[in-house]
Amino acid sequence: MEVIPAIDLLGGQCVRLYQGDYQQAQVFNNDPVQVARTWAEQGATRLHVVDLDGAKQGESVNLGAIAKIAAAIDIPVQVGGGLRTVESVAQLFDVGVERAILGTAAVDNPDLVTELCAKYPGRIAVGIDARDGKVATKGWLETSAVLATDLAKQMATQGVAAIIYTDIHRDGTMAGPNLEALRELAATIEIPVIASGGVSSLADLVNLVALEGIGVTGAIVGRAIYTGDINLAEAVKAVGPQRLQDVFPDDGTAIA
């Protein structure tokens, strides 16, 4: 399983939110480039970057910082937040980003997703951020009537490379991932699912590895690697692609 460290950018700084609340942003570092280098040095095979300002404003805001991050490390960078036009996605790819993550646009403008998947095959993912099973949009400030599972099925037919699923109630809480919701989502689609939100320990990652067989191929880790609850290098060795020990598949009895 791919263990993917997250960098959330707000005002050019590396922050973490609590349940998506911008008023509860905690600054962990004012040099996101150095943070990116640290995670790459510890064995990360991919970096997840969110432009929080962009998600709120509907356009890329931290493009300069993102460009510096992409130039500073040799691993693929995926970016989400405020990507609602072909031009905004093209800008990211022009500065070295490997994968773009669409969120609000997937709900409001699914034709854009289709167009981008055709233009950039294999490089478009959709982030489904759910609150009580319903898709949240516009930087999690609004909750739609769309079910997360329905959106995932629709996006899978439109050619997206992966679904990044975030349970907002778990995000930043260190309460563990929502295994039941992940299991349900992964079972409905054939494309990879990347889990996000609530991962707080190596045990949480092991529980997610047990879902690899049904398509959960990665886990985004945020607050826990900044607080030290998870040592990224150890996590990559324990559950990453080169791990020495297999984990038994989840038969549905794991507690979410």
UniProtKB/Swiss-Prot annotation:
Its EC number is 5.3.1.16. Keywords: Amino-acid biosynthesis, Cytoplasm, Histidine biosynthesis, Isomerase. GO terms for biological process: L-histidine biosynthetic process; L-tryptophan biosynthetic process. Coiled coil: none annotated. Its main location: cytoplasm. It is an enzyme of class 5 (isomerase). InterPro entries: Aldolase_TIM, His_biosynth, HisA_bact_arch, Isoase_HisA-like, Isoase_HisA-like_bact, RibuloseP-bd_barrel. Transmembrane segments: none annotated. Belongs to the HisA/HisF family. NCBIfam families: 1-(5-phosphoribosyl)-5-[(5-phosphoribosylamino)methylideneamino]imidazole-4-carboxamide isomerase, PRK13585.1. This is 1-(5-phosphoribosyl)-5-[(5-phosphoribosylamino)methylideneamino] imidazole-4-carboxamide isomerase. It comes from Picosynechococcus sp. (strain ATCC 27264 / PCC 7002 / PR-6). The lineage of its organism: Bacteria, Bacillati, Cyanobacteriota, Cyanophyceae, Oscillatoriophycideae.
